[in-house]
Design a protein with these regions (language model features):
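Glycine-rich N-terminal segment of FAD-binding domains in flavoprotein oxidoreductases
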Residues: 49-58, 67-152
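A glycine- and small-aliphatic-rich helix-loop capping segment at beta-alpha/alpha-beta transitions
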Residues: 83-85, 135-155, 183-187, 211-218, ...
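Conserved phosphate/anionic-ligand binding catalytic regions in large, soluble enzymes, centered on
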Residues: 131-136, 204-205, 250-265, 443-447, ...
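Flexible inter-domain linker/hinge segments
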Residues: 1-55, 112, 208
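Alpha-helix capping/hinge segments and adjacent helical runs
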Residues: 63, 479-491, 516, 520-524
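C-terminal substrate-recognition/cap domain of FAD-linked oxidoreductases
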Residues: 12-29, 60-88, 279, 284, ...
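Activity-critical C-terminal alpha-helical subdomain
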Residues: 495-531
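FAD-binding subdomain of flavoenzyme oxidoreductases
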Residues: 155-309, 523
Length: 531
C-alpha cells in the first residue's frame, strides 16, 4: 500500500461533483483547505541496531529477510487510521521500527523472540498493515530498539479437510488470497471486512475482526477453530475439538491478543461451500428506530440473512447525494427522508430464496418497504471503496474517520444519541460543523454494533489533535452509556486507556498476569492492549 493513503496510488480517485457540493455547502470545505503529502519531506528515524545486531538477525532468518532500509521500515511505521494518514502530511518525521525481519517458520519466530528477550529489543507483528487503532506503533516499551516481524512467508494453505469443513492457513494469507486458495477446492471463508483487500488472517484473529457477512457466517473469532501462537516461552497450539469442557478455552485468551502475548503463525478456520446462489433486496424504513426494531426481529426470529445493514437518516442522505451508480437511481425518492436497509442471502438456490422470503416478511411487518435488489447489488459492488474515498476527502480538506461500538438492543438508542452528541459537540467546538452518520451492520439476538462515520472540516494547525479530542469525547460517551470500547477495530493504543473501565481491575490484572507469564521480558508489541 501507499504510505499516505489506503491501497495503491493507482486506486486514488477524484471527488465527484455531488461530494464536492456537499463538502462546500454543509461543511465549508474546499480543495484549498486540504493538506497534501510531500514524499520528499518524509524522514525516517535512524535505526538503533548495530551491524552486529543485523548479523545476529540474519543468522536466524537469512540476510535477505532482514532490512534496515528506510523504504522497508517506513511502510511498517504507521497503520491506516485517519491520524496515521494525516501524520504523513503534517508530521513527516517518522518513528520507524529499527529493522524489518521476515522469519520463514515457527522455529525462526521462536528464535527471534528469544533474541529479542536477550537483547532487550521489542517486536511488533506485521501482517497487512491495516490497523486503525495504533496497533502498529513501534513502541520500544523501554527496550533499546524495536523490530517489525513481518509474516510475509506464512502465506500457504497448509491443509484442507472438506469432511469437517476446516482449513489451516498461514497467518500472512490476505483475505483475497484466502478466497483464491479455498475456491480451488470449492470452498469459501466468507469473511469480508472493510480491510479485506489487504488484511491477513493472523490480523483478523488477533483483532477479533468482524466482516460484512457476519450475520450469515459469524465474526472471525467464531470461525477460528484453532490457532498457533509462538510466545517467548514456547508454542501454544489452541483448539482441538469443535467443543470442549477441558477448562477455559485457550483460544479465547489468544484471539484478540493483538501480538501482546506472541506471534500468531497459522489459523484453523471453519469453511463452507462456495454459495450456489446470491440474492439481494433493499428496504426503506421511515426512521432509524423503526428499522432497528425490524432488524432485531429478524435476528431474534432467526430469519438468517447473510448480510443485513441499516443506515441512519444522515448516512442514507449522504449515500444518495454522493452516489453515481444505481443505488442512487433506484433508491432516490423511495429512501429519501428515511433509512436504507440492505440484505444479501447466500447458499443453495432454495435456501437463499427461503431465507429471503422469511426476512422480507419480517421487515415488511416491521414497517419496511421493499426497494428491490438494485441498491443492495450496488452496495456490494462498491463495498470496499470507502477507504479510497476517505483518501480523496482528506486531500480536499475534510476530516473523515470512523469508530464503532456495540451494546444490547435496549441501550442502543441511548448509546447512539450519546456518541453522536459527543462527536458533534467536540467538532463544533473546534470550529467546524460535523456530519455524524451511523449504521448497524452486525446483529445478535441480544444487541448490535453501531458504526459511526464522521465528516467535518480540518481546522487549525494540527488536525490530528482535532480528531483525537473528538475521539476521546466519543470514547468517554461510549463508556458512560455502557457500550464496548470496540466491537471489531481492536484495542491497540487508542482504546487502551478505556479498557479497564470495561473489564475491571481484576480483569486487567488477569491480562497483565498472562502477559507476564508468556512474555516475561515484555518484548511483544509493548504499549498495545494491556492496561
Amino acid at each position: 500500500m501507499a504510505l499516505s493513503r489506503w491501497g495503491t496510488d493507482a486506486e486514488a480517485r477524484e471527488l465527484g461533483e455531488g461530494i464536492r457540493d456537499l463538502l462546500r455547502d454543509v461543511l465549508g470545505v474546499t480543495a484549498e483547505t486540504g493538506r497534501t503529502f510531500d514524499p520528499a519531506a518524509v524522514s525516517a528515524s535512524p535505526s538503533r541496531l548495530s551491524d552486529a545486531d543485523v548479523r545476529a538477525l540474519a543468522a536466524v532468518v537469512g540476510r535477505g529477510n532482514v532490512s534496515v532500509d528506510d523504504d522497508q521500515r517506513l511502510p511498517r511505521a504507521r497503520g491506516k487510521s485517519t491520524p496515521d494518514l494525516l501524520a504523513w502530511r503534517v508530521r513527516p518525521e517518522v518513528d520507524c521500527p529499527d529493522a524489518v525481519v521476515a522469519p520463514r517458520d515457527d522455529d525462526e519466530v521462536a528464535a527471534l523472540l528469544d533474541w529479542c528477550g536477550r537483547e532487550s529489543v521489542a517486536m511488533v507483528p506485521f501482517g497487512g498493515g491495516t490497523s486503525v487503532v495504533g496497533g502498529l506503533t513501534p513502541d520500544t516499551g523501554g527496550h533499546r530498539a524495536v523490530i517489525s516481524l513481518d509474516l510475509a512467508h506464512f502465506t500457504e494453505l497448509e491443509s484442507i479437510d472438506p469432511v469437517s469443513g476446516e482449513a489451516v492457513l498461514g497467518a500472512g494469507v490476505t483475505g483475497p488470497r484466502a478466497e483464491e486458495l479455498l475456491s480451488g477446492h470449492g470452498f469459501s471463508l466468507g469473511h469480508f471486512p472493510q480491510s479485506f483487500p489487504y488484511a491477513t488472517l493472523g490480523g483478523f484473529a488477533m483483532t477479533r475482526s468482524s466482516g460484512q457477512n457476519s450475520a450469515g457466517y459469524g465474526r472471525f473469532d467464531e470461525m477460528v477453530r484453532g490457532l498457533t501462537v509462538v510466545t517467548p516461552v514456547g508454542v501454544i497450539e489452541a483448539g482441538r475439538a469443535p467443543a470442549s469442557a477441558a477448562g477455559p478455552d485457550l483460544r479465547q485468551w489468544l484471539l484478540g491478543s493483538e501480538g501482546a502475548f506472541g506471534v500468531c503463525t497459522r489459523v484453523r478456520v471453519r469453511i463452507h461451500p462456495v454459495p450456489e446462489a446470491v440474492r439481494y433486496e433493499a428496504f426503506r424504513f421511515p426512521d432509524f428506530a423503526t428499522g432497528a426494531a425490524a432488524l432485531r426481529a429478524v435476528e431474534q426470529q432467526g430469519a438468517g440473512p447473510t448480510v443485513i445493514r441499516l443506515s441512519d437518516e444522515t448516512e442514507t442522505m449522504v449515500n444518495l447525494a454522493t452516489s453515481t451508480d444505481s443505488i442512487g437511481e433506484q433508491a432516490d425518492g423511495a429512501a429519501s427522508g428515511g433509512c436504507l436497509c440492505l440484505c444479501l442471502f447466500e447458499g443453495t438456490a432454495e435456501h437463499a430464496a427461503s431465507r429471503q422470503d422469511e426476512t422480507r416478511a419480517v421487515l415488511l411487518a416491521g414497517g419496511g418497504t421493499s426497494l428491490g435488489p438494485e441498491p443492495a447489488q450496488a452496495w456490494e459492488h462498491g463495498r470496499f471503496g470507502a477507504p479510497v474515498l476517505r483518501d480523496a476527502l482528506l486531500d480536499n480538506g475534510a476530516l473523515v474517520e470512523t469508530l464503532e461500538t456495540a451494546t444490547d438492543w435496549a441501550r442502543l438508542p441511548a448509546l447512539r444519541e450519546a456518541v453522536t452528541g459527543a462527536l458533534t459537540a467536540a467538532l463544533e467546538a473546534s470550529g467546524t460543523p460535523a456530519l455524524v452518520m451511523c449504521h448497524i451492520s452486525h446483529v445478535y439476538p441480544t444487541g448490535a454494533s453501531l458504526y459511526f462515520t464522521v465528516v467535518a472540516g480540518q481546522r487549525g494547525e494540527d488536525p490530528i489533535e482535532q480528531w483525537m479530542v473528538a475521539k476521546r469525547a466519543a470514547s468517554e460517551a461510549i463508556v458512560s452509556a455502557g457500550g464496548t470500547i470496540t466491537h471489531h477495530h481492536a484495542v491497540g493504543t487508542d482504546h487502551r486507556p478505556y479498557l479497564e473501565a470495561e473489564i475491571g481491575d481484576v480483569g486487567s490484572r488477569m491480562l497483565r498476569a498472562v502477559k507476564s507469564a508468556l512474555d516475561p521480558h515484555g518484548v511483544c508489541n509493548p504499549g498495545t492492549l494491556i492496561p
